[in-house]
């Protein structure tokens, strides 16, 4: 163990800055934090919620739906207790669901699965991950206001590697348990304008693990609450071929409260330290541009989104979805 620590702190090239040596040492001590596992897991849970809300709120009572999602997230300097992180994440997944009307309530269930990778080039680090999750959701209307609620669980299974002297090859699982509610009301002002407000609770829990060099990282957890506040503008028109086509645009501000940092305790060679990693923004701005085409019982849609967060986050996403109502 001593020789491993010495190798991490020794610059055999004579070209590394003290900051780079510290960055590589931190990556060896806590590869999950260095590769943004907590952020990636939370984003996958949000991805499932977005899919559920898109289909719970589209006005049909009974149906089956499927959504294909792909996207890229960049974190350019998200803060930690030591060196800031620059991360690139690509993720691609599939969500499927179904819903049915029971009196004046629509009940639904959905499942998602996918894979992706996160890279931290500064330490030759990579997280090759798979993810999956499920959601139960419901929708009703009270005095013209649509009320939607969902309960979900998602898991991220990460294979973590870090190159160089760190030479890490390990794995871990991160779980996200979440519940959310949203209220919205549509006003016809020549176009349909739908203001909405919600509250989404996320509890993130990472399993403890030990690296191939005997570094032990303990379990860690945190809870945050997001408050998405925004509106969607939508206009439907009929084509000569009988399709109803509806372009849309939505914009939301999402303030976040709670434990936006995770404290991760590490033990190695008889010593103990705690690493701090920010995994969520204080505030995000989310936007989405989409179009749907409906004919008879079938709906097909395409949407593209862009998010910005105060922790130097930027994310682009594309969703293709289809639904058959009966």
What are these regions (language model features)?
Residues 1, 10, 58-326:
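Membrane translocator/pore-forming domains, dominated by Gram-negative outer-membrane beta-barrels
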Residues 1-79:
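Interface/linker segment at the passenger-translocator junction
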């Amino acid at each position: 163990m001593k020789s491993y620590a010495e190798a991490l702190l020794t610059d055999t090239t004579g070209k590394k800055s003290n900051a780079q040596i510290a960055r590589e040492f931190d990556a060896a001590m806590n590869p999950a934090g260095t590769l943004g596992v907590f952020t990636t897991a939370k984003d996958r849970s949000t991805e499932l919620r977005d899919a559920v809300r898109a289909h719970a709120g589209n006005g049909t009572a009974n149906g089956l739906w499927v959504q294909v999602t792909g996207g890229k997230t960049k974190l350019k300097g998200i803060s930690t207790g030591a060196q800031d992180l620059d991360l690139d994440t690509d993720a691609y997944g599939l969500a499927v669901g179904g819903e049915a009307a029971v009196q004046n309530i629509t009940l639904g269930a959905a499942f998602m699965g996918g894979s992706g990778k996160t890279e931290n080039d500064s330490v030759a680090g990579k997280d090759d991950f798979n993810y999956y999750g499920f959601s139960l959701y419901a929708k009703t209307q009270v005095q013209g206001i649509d009320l939607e609620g969902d309960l979900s669980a998602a898991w991220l299974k990460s294979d973590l590697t870090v190159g160089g002297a760190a030479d890490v090859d390990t794995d871990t699982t991160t779980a996200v348990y979440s519940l959310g509610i949203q209220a919205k009301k549509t006003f016809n002002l020549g176009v349909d304008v739908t203001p909405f407000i919600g509250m989404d609770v996320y509890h993130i829990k990472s399993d403890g693990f030990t690296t191939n060099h005997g570094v032990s990282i303990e379990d860690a957890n945190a809870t945050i609450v997001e408050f998405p506040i925004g509106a969607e503008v939508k206009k439907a028109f009929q084509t000569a071929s009988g399709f109803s086509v509806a372009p849309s645009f939505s914009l939301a501000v999402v303030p976040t409260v709670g434990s936006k940092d995770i404290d991760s305790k590490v033990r190695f060679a008889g010593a103990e330290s705690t690493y701090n990693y920010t995994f969520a923004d204080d505030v995000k701005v989310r936007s989405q541009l989409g179009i749907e085409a409906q004919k008879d019982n079938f709906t097909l849609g395409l949407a593209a989104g862009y998010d910005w967060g105060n922790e130097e986050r930027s994310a682009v996403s594309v969703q293709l979805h289809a639904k058959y109502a009966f």
